Curated annotation (Swiss-Prot):
Database matches in InterPro entries: ATP-PRT_HisG_long, ATP_PRibTrfase_cat, ATP_PRibTrfase_CS, ATP_PRibTrfase_HisG, HisG_C, N-reg_PII-like_a/b, N-reg_PII/ATP_PRibTrfase_C
EC number: 2.4.2.17
Source organism superkingdom: Archaea
Name the UniProt record assigns to this protein: ATP phosphoribosyltransferase
Length: 289
């Protein structure tokens, strides 16, 4: 059995549920039902709901074989786990922020000052790298209030949009750490449980497909070379003969290719100009690596 620890709430919960569904491993039930455990469509893969901050240690200690959580939390805990895959969601930054009416402009301006944070290890390492001596004060929440009540001169805290800091009259002056969500594994489990790599492959296939589209078109044989020059594709387009052509005496070919989504507008217009017709653009659910 493989036990996967995933966030039980917060901004990481819904994207995690979604990517498992897209990967063909939908989770039955959810944390909203107050359950600690859930099943997937694979009887050998079970889900454990946990606080995102606790998941690195759960995986390190073997309570879970696999986990999904932010790389910031993994780094802060110093967890001895294998990082398998950047899932590319849950993007956030740990920022150094000061009161908006202060004169602090950079980390060096905070020599000898107090810094409040929920990430003391990352914060300590950041200031050490800059050669700045500060007093790091660990807090468990409401970090934004600490400069306004005299507890700290600045904070290091997670910022996704900057709205919360703006509301609390704080201004970011430096980015301390950039984070996304990662798939991690227990070292021993990874060595002994082959299905962990199957899970990685399934999730990776969703990421591979996310920003790509499948193009299908009919092309006169005389235009094939021009069409091939337009299409970047993954490993060149697939070309097949169309048995029934509406144009007597002219062979029609079906051409299929996978292209980046942000190139679709440009590529389709170029294809039409060189003779492609009946162009279809289709979403891709998964591309297996």
């Amino acid at each position: 059995m493989i036990r996967i620890a995933i966030p039980n709430k917060g901004r990481l919960y819904e994207p995690t549920i979604s990517i498992f569904k897209d990967a063909g491993l939908p989770i039955s039930g959810g944390a909203e039902s107050r359950k600690l455990f859930a099943k997937t469509t694979d009887p050998d893969i079970h889900i454990l709901f946990a606080r995102a901050a606790d998941i690195p240690e759960y995986v390190q200690d073997g309570a879970a074989d696999v986990g999904i959580t932010g790389i910031d939390l993994i780094t802060e805990r110093g967890a001895k786990v294998e990082t398998l895959l950047d899932l590319k969601f849950g993007k956030a930054s740990l920022v150094l922020a000061v009161p908006e009416d202060s004169d602090f402009q950079k980390a060096e301006d905070l020599e000898g000052r107090k810094i409040a944070t929920e990430f003391p290890e990352i914060t300590h390492q950041y200031f050490k790298k800059h050669g700045v001596n500060v007093e790091v004060i660990k807090v468990s929440g409401a970090c934004e209030m600490t400069p306004h009540v005299g507890i700290a001169d600045a904070i290091v805290d997670i910022s996704s949009s900057g709205t919360t800091m703006m509301i609390n009259h704080l201004k970011p002056i430096e980015t301390v750490f950039s984070s996304t969500v990662y798939l991690i594994a227990n070292k021993e489990s990874l060595r002994t449980k082959e299905k962990i790599l199957d899970i990685k492959t399934a999730l990776e296939s969703v990421l591979n497909a996310k920003d790509r589209r499948y193009l299908m078109m009919n092309v006169p044989e005389s235009s094939l070379q021009a069409v091939k020059e337009v299409l970047p594709g993954m490993s060149g387009p697939t070309v097949m003969k169309v048995e029934s052509s509406k144009l007597p005496g002219e062979s029609i070919l079906a051409v299929h290719a996978v292209v980046d989504a942000d190139l679709i507008f440009t590529i389709v217009n170029k294809l039409k100009k060189v003779g492609a017709r009946d162009v279809l653009v289709v979403p891709i659910e998964r591309i297996m690596p």
